[in-house]
Amino acid sequence: MGTTSDEMVSVEQTSSSSLNPLCFECGQQHWTRENHLYNYQNEVDDDLVCHICLQPLLQPLDTPCGHTFCYKCLRNFLQEKDFCPLDRKRLHFKLCKKSSILVHKLLDKLLVLCPFSSVCKDVMQRCDLEAHLKNRCPGASHRRVALERRKTSRTQAEIENENGPTLLDPAGTLSPEADCLGTGAVPVERHLTSASLSTWSEEPGLDNPAFEESAGADTTQQPLSLPEGEITTIEIHRSNPYIQLGISIVGGNETPLINIVIQEVYRDGVIARDGRLLAGDQILQVNNYNISNVSHNYARAVLSQPCNTLHLTVLRERRFGNRAHNHSDSNSPREEIFQVALHKRDSGEQLGIKLVRRTDEPGVFILDLLEGGLAAQDGRLSSNDRVLAINGHDLKYGTPELAAQIIQASGERVNLTIARPGKPQPGNTIREAGNHSSSSQHHTPPPYYSRPSSHKDLTQCVTCQEKHITVKKEPHESLGMTVAGGRGSKSGELPIFVTSVPPHGCLARDGRIKRGDVLLNINGIDLTNLSHSEAVAMLKASAASPAVALKALEVQIVEEATQNAEEQPSTFSENEYDASWSPSWVMWLGLPSTLHSCHDIVLRRSYLGSWGFSIVGGYEENHTNQPFFIKTIVLGTPAYYDGRLKCGDMIVAVNGLSTVGMSHSALVPMLKEQRNKVTLTVICWPGSLV
């Protein structure tokens, strides 16, 4: 449920009422059995509205008869009735299914106003409101403190007035103070009872703990779902082999990211329900396909293959400095030990080596070499080499962090002592973590071997061709295409683009407008700076003419046949009216700069720690002008708590200074020198859905 800005409800005006408890997930007053309340900034499209509560959908469910309702609205309705609210066909709640991930994403992107409007004027996406209330909103923070003080004083008064202990929460109930927290919102000051915890955990549609906001010191001490700095294999099951995994991905060897990185994990998806993968995790292998250094679209095709069981080899980069680790003895084969001396042009030059640790063998190992880097040019090092020592410092039981510190502190000469096994040891390269298989047969994936990094300039991977088309049609005939995007759209600042061209339509007969084309102009009217609703209105108005002139940009991704024919994943032929189609992340990267939409993100910190993100790119990494990409967001840092930066975002300026042509070794010190505040100008493109 919710309201638009014209009928906005301020929580300060109603919070004194004792009838409805205050929910700290939405910041409004409602009972836990009711939907969250939101103050929406704009009118919401009818297709995204529940026809029971007449508000934007929350936890949407699809009925077999083709209608969509809020989870709680439909559940409450079917407790008394046995038919669909719209067409009155017989309906059972168990036959309803969760709506597609795309619908969830559209709903999550709806803009809402902070309910504490007297002290906070922020506008954000609906999915970001809970994190805003937990970590950034002064009004919510003051309200939590006031409720906690009221609870403490009331509890003390009850204890003083009673000889024996007072049971505040009888079986099956919650005290008014506990109930005012609302379903699914757990402030730092309180803990859920076991009864309420089970109810909260089983409620469909709530955030998966795997990507829950960290709200206090205790949360960072909880065990991680995957080990950090280690290559791990997990097993994912899905009952329907054709259902999407529920993640968006960025990366690929067209970019400095090289590997495939998870940008977002969508609630209610297969990956979210599994609960182990997070945004920022790298996917190195899918079943028998090594995707550690392949094109973005090849990796997307591999991840989109229909199968009931996926074995994903993943890497979660280390996020915390001092993490205990166990060393185990390993029966390694005969090793070749040799010395490698690398000479840097200056002390700030990067070696271009990616170091990791393994779970069953101590020490530091080379995961990857960046093309154009010093180590790759030298040619003597390779992936899977073990680093025994650097400049005389013993690393037989060392960590990648220690190795990085030694390299950073060294001068222009770095001496490496390397051990190379006589033959590969598959058992030493992959760890099976938390296998969810119910089968007694243990799956052992093939060994992971990293390919040399070889990304190239994006201009070689994506081509854009402008085309001018004039179509003649009947006055009342529609153009016959569906579009998405628009400035301020739910998926981000995107241009208007074609999502499908239905058969038998005017444009389908003409054949020149294709799915994925970016629309620039119609009948002389510019579309590039319009919102989605404005662009749709303009297209409909122009379609009334007997002749329609379109200017569009055809974006094509150039694929190289780098994989053998037998390695190619099986793909299904796609037609121009495929309802499940969504654009590729690489498609956005190739757009001309005139279609880019930059926005500023201001990060603040009260201590001289990390800003909380890692970057790749810059001139030094491959001797071309590659942009800077965000690769990792670190838990418990300013970037993480702010919530706006995502993996795959491009940093185009820092404090107004352009990063074009800047080297990696120049940008990193600049970011570190900023003390309490930094302004990042970024371009954010949505990752590819899989």
From Swiss-Prot:
Give the ZnF (RING-type) ranges. 50-88
The biological processes this protein is annotated with in GO are: neural precursor cell proliferation; neuron differentiation
Keyword Repeat set for record: yes
Q: Gene3D superfamilies under this entry?
A: 2.30.42.10, Zinc/RING finger domain, C3HC4 (zinc finger)
Superkingdom field: Eukaryota
| Assembly description | Interacts with the phosphotyrosine interaction domain of NUMB.
Q: What is this protein called?
A: Ligand of Numb protein X 2
Q: Which gene encodes it?
A: LNX2
